[in-house]
Amino acid sequence: MAITLTNFTFLYMDANLKRLGDIVLGFGANVVTLLLILILTITRRNGRCNRRKSYIEKCLLYVTPALGACLSCVDLVLLVRTNRRREVILCFVPLSGFVMWIAVILSLKFACCACHVFTSQILCFWWIFRFLTDALHLNMIFTLQRVQEICLIMLDIAFGISINVLRIKQAHPKIIPLEDPLIEDDDDQKRIVRRLFLEKNGSWWDLFTFGYIGSIMKHGSVKQLELENLLTLPPEMDPFTCCENLLRCWQLQECNNYSTPSLIWSIYGVYGWPYFRLGLLKVFNDCIGFAGPLLLNRLIKSFLDTQYTFRLSKLKLKLRSSIMSVIYRKCLWVNTANRSGFSEGEIQTFMSVDADRIVNLCNSLHDLWSLPLQIGIALYLLYTQVKFAFLSGLAITILLIPVNKWISVLIASATEKMMKLKDERIRKTGELLTNIRTLKMYGWDNWFADWLKETRATEVTHLATRKYLDAWCVFFWATTPTLFSLCTFGLFALMGHQLDAATVFTCLALFNSLISPLNSFPWVINGLIDAFISTRRVSKFLCCLEHSRDFSIDSGFTSEDLAVCVEDASCTWSSNVEEDYNLTIKQVSLRVPKGSFVAVIGEVGSGKTSLLNSLLGEMRCVHGSILLNGSVAYVPQVPWLLSGTVRENILFGKPFDSKRYFETLSACALDVDISLMVGGDMACIGDKGLNLSGGQRARFALARAVYHGSDMYLLDDVLSAVDSQVGCWILQRALLGPLLNKKTRVMCTHNIQAISCADMIVVMDKGKVNWSGSVTDMPKSISPTFSLTNEFDMSSPNHLTKRKETLSIKEDGVDEISEAAADIVKLEERKEGRVEMMVYRNYAVFSGWFITIVILVSAVLMQGSRNGNDLWLSYWVDKTGKGVSHYSTSFYLMVLCIFCIINSILTLVRAFSFAFGGLKAAVHVHNALISKLINAPTQFFDQTPSGRILNRFSSDLYTIDDSLPFILNILLANFVGLLGIIVVLSYVQVLFLLLLLPFWYIYSKLQVFYRSTSRELRRLDSVSRSPIYASFTETLDGSSTIRAFKSEEHFVGRFIEHLTLYQRTSYSEIIASLWLSLRLQLLGSMIVLFVAVMAVLGSGGNFPISFGTPGLVGLALSYAAPLVSLLGSLLTSFTETEKEMVSVERVLQYMDVPQEEVSGPQSLSDKWPVHGLVEFHNVTMRYISTLPPALTQISFTIQGGMHVGVIGRTGAGKSSILNALFRLTPVCSGEILVDGKNISHLPIRELRSCLAVVPQSPFLFQGSLRDNLDPLGLSEDWRIWEILDKCKVKAAVESVGGLDSYVKESGCSFSVGQRQLLCLARALLKSSKILCLDECTANIDVHTASLLHNTISSECKGVTVITIAHRISTVVDLDSILILDRGILVEQGKPQHLLQDDSSTFSSFVRASQ
């Protein structure tokens, strides 16, 4: 920038020796610049540009400094000729400037490698440095009111700014160094990365002014932004690096034997020094706010504000990614037992709410000292104006400190209680979303929703306490400036001093500077409290012991002989040391040789699954040792699948091996299934595999383990979900086939054939190993359970052949959703354009129109009372200044006091009405969202990942609860504040408003240009946030599987990818807001300059515009100063409000989801159905309109009281019969009659409540066992105990404490088999005339299953029972059977009759199982 020194010449010619400091300042500026030029010349000597510069570049690079040198020379000549008798020192400035310009020319010619003029470090430094020195001199000249010299310097500065905003659009050339080193050191690598980042985002000047966001702003203003348009993260903001840094500090605390490692100290260790360095910038920024003149204040503060915010925001983003990554890693490395002290909802809250609150600590911690500093400086300046009169106002401030502390303690208590209830609500919401299908079949969806609303109501009670306490804080601190001015001016007048315009309006400006720190202080304290509470919560979770698995044996066996060694091990699921007596595995000793096939058997609840989990290290071993040798693959009893493609689920992070991959698919009987899927193995599996049948989910989980190629396989009842033919194939080809026959396999099973093939059998009983040995040595006295005849005989010579034949049958029927695992997961919807007015209107409706009107009216009147207070002060000053006042000082004080009281009352009304309206909106939004989701069809949940829905209930609802009311309050305050200024300025001088019109036009253009992009960025932010929570929720469900496969790092990598995308959206959003902020502040500085010049010229009487009396002039100037900041704040707060409104918009998207037809034209009596007659007439049903039907022209009749079995291969459409009967999926054609009534004409919840079902996936929610069995309280205790006894689960219930015992999350207090028995008891308690059993005995042993069928036969006489089964023995004695294949009813009739027909399908099933 060619900053000439002509203006300095005029200054120094008229200066005396008292201005020697100014001369030294200018001389020092040139000398420092010269030294820096020399340093940069030396350090950049080797960098050369290999292309010719353009004509424009040459002008800017060479002509500009040459012009500066010439002007400096002219200044020097003029100075010598006109000031021959002056001190020689006056020549130092132009002389040094001349030398400096020559150095610039030489350095650009021989040393600078800048191929783009704005990437020159030398010129950039010179532009900025000379700009600041000119500004410092401008400060002095303003105090002298030398208008001519002010104009000269402002022209000089304007010339420099005009050059800086010039852009040269061309590509950066490749730098060719003289020597290319063979190996680059780390510093070179860092410089290369840094240069690439600069080349990606723009020049140094662009970085300083955030110009590199310009291309995104232009793109976002004309079209929709996509994720690939976002800015690239700087290298130091890489989430993986941030996570590693924080993790290193945390582990350092653990290594130093800290009793309880603290997250806050770990954060300090990583970010403490960079954060406190920002404090130095903030000190300078705060202090400059009280410096003069006004122009210099605003120019410097504009850059300081944005740079401080930019660096603080980068640190906050790094901290956020660190905390979220560390929490995610901890979830992967902490075993199930140690994690049992935390519910899933609580852990999800750590990730969503607590992480944000800890990050906000960065704002609050600096504000904790910065705000008192600003208050202290303002008070000192008040002292210089009104002496000790300010102490009266200070006394009010001091009195409010203990009040604020007491309120803060109450807020902290309410916040902690609210967070616990928020955790519980998120957990319950997760349970609702996970088990929505089962809840609908039970008809409990409304009851569960009401239960969730009760929890929300309790949470809102504590939220209300917090909000109303916040309202008191806002009231106390918002009224403080008004009370301060009343007490200060009152005491000053009573002390005998006369109020003048200079004193009053200087004090008013200082009072205004007190408003922001005083109003912000309660929010700062609340933020600190929330942050420290969240820090303690997260620290407690991070202190959990991590999972470990070792192998070391000192015995006769060598590590080459043994795969598993368990020595006197006792394990518990509890993480509490005080509960060590509650053992699940008791004194177990077990040794498994390598390569053996071990069958773990036992009755339901005997500890089979717990034994496998103890081997995995998921339980806490309180005694003995458990040691494994080699890698492990694990298949849980409830299969866990990722939301992704089929191939991703099977590979599980392993490289793709074509040969092994297809061998695995064939061995697990998946080749035909996948070939029939839309997209093959690239078809998408929905959330938790909901678009697959139960058997398909089990086989995919098994295929993952088989493909993994581990040394040891722990399999938990993998054959229970498949039919006998598929089970035989899997046993032969997978478990005993070439892929696994040399591996160690430990399998919990009830499958007789698998038991007979085992090398070793382990019999579990009540958590102990009752017996172990080979199948031939097993004594019959142990249990009659396993001495039954095999269900199918592998020695059958034609069995495998039949399996191959039947495998070709198209398996495209699906138990639950669709025939093919098509890509049914819908991408998250993202709105385009501005937030519609309907969103604001809906939020107002949620808050209530009356409250909305009260808020608006009170805010306007509050601002009016404050403006009236200032106008009265102006009137008081004018009257007393002229000496013509007809009223006493006490009269003026009384009127001032009335304004103060009115303002305080209105402030209180506004604060509490805002709190009430925000709470009312929060309650209505949550309840409306729950009601809409409860009535949504199951297809919506199948196509929408639960993590995406849960994001609405966690992050978006948190915004509606907390952030949105806060930013709306700020928006309203800015709006009425600006309205008040405009009214007052209109009263003072109407023509003054004409000056604002062009500036307002520029402001509005900037705002329109910015808003469109900011909306898109906020929507991208919300969309990119959902995969994080979906991935997190998914990982919580499958963490034990991930740990077993040792795939933690793979999943951390997936999470880092999601987090990086989220960070990029946030980073782009921050840069865009700073882009706007800087330009608004710079434009505001120009407005202030213009107003100030007008005021100075107008005061001389030669200017056409007059400002009236001194009081009005002072009032106009004091109101003009905050005008620009209010304009900027209004636009910023409006944009931020629009961003926060995106959360309301996202919630409203779910208000429009399709709804089930809840009502019906026909009503039902209390005793319906009376007979239990079920009729299907030509029923066709499909889950998705684009896929083939799951049921095709199904017709059958089940007479009342009949026990009917439904069989077929895995995925044949058996469960689709129940889906149609319970109206989970509407039928395309045909009709279903129950007791002669068409069920499509019946109220849907009444229909479902009249039917009883035991689902394929047992469901127990967290709460008392009594509520799980009889949530509506319709059964007596004796009846419940009787049913529990008949369902063979009474002993298990008694062992955990009876009906009032607490069921843990997901029913993990009981085994899967016990959960199925409890679900059967729940169904029998309903005493319905129609009972549907969907594989209710799949996870229990054959003996218990036989006893249960006897119970069902005795308890369900006269009841229609529809049984879906894989075991042939389950349906052989029923009254009738239905055989399905590919959704078609291929055969029906009595089992005995079908057996007599050798050509029947049922006969072939029986022959294959004999």
UniProtKB/Swiss-Prot annotation:
Localization annotation: Membrane
Q: Which domain of life is it from?
A: Eukaryota
According to its record, how does it sit in the membrane?
Answer: Multi-pass membrane protein
What role does this protein play? Pump for glutathione S-conjugates.
Q: What is the lineage of its organism?
A: Eukaryota, Viridiplantae, Streptophyta, Embryophyta, Tracheophyta
Which gene is the coding source of this polypeptide chain?
A: ABCC13
Which segments constitute the ABC transporter domain? 564-791, 1174-1407
Query: From its record, what is one biological process in GO terms?
Result: transmembrane transport
Q: Which residues bind ATP 1?
A: 602-609
Quote the SUPFAM superfamilies the UniProt record gives: ABC transporter transmembrane region, P-loop containing nucleoside triphosphate hydrolases
The transmembrane segments are 23-43, 60-80, 88-108, 122-142, 148-168, 391-411, 474-494, 505-525, 844-864, 889-909, 963-985, 990-1009, 1087-1107, 1111-1131
Q: Does the keyword Translocase apply?
A: yes
Q: What protein am I looking at?
A: ABC transporter C family member 13
Which protein family is named in the record? Belongs to the ABC transporter superfamily. ABCC family. Conjugate transporter (TC 3.A.1.208) subfamily.
Query: Taking every annotated instance into account, which residue ranges of this chain make up the domain ABC transmembrane type-1?
Result: 255-530, 852-1139
Q: Known InterPro entries for this protein?
A: AAA+_ATPase, ABC1_TM_dom, ABC1_TM_sf, ABC_transporter-like_ATP-bd, ABC_transporter-like_CS, ABC_transporter_C-like, P-loop_NTPase
Q: Which PROSITE patterns match?
A: ABC_TM1F, ABC_TRANSPORTER_1, ABC_TRANSPORTER_2
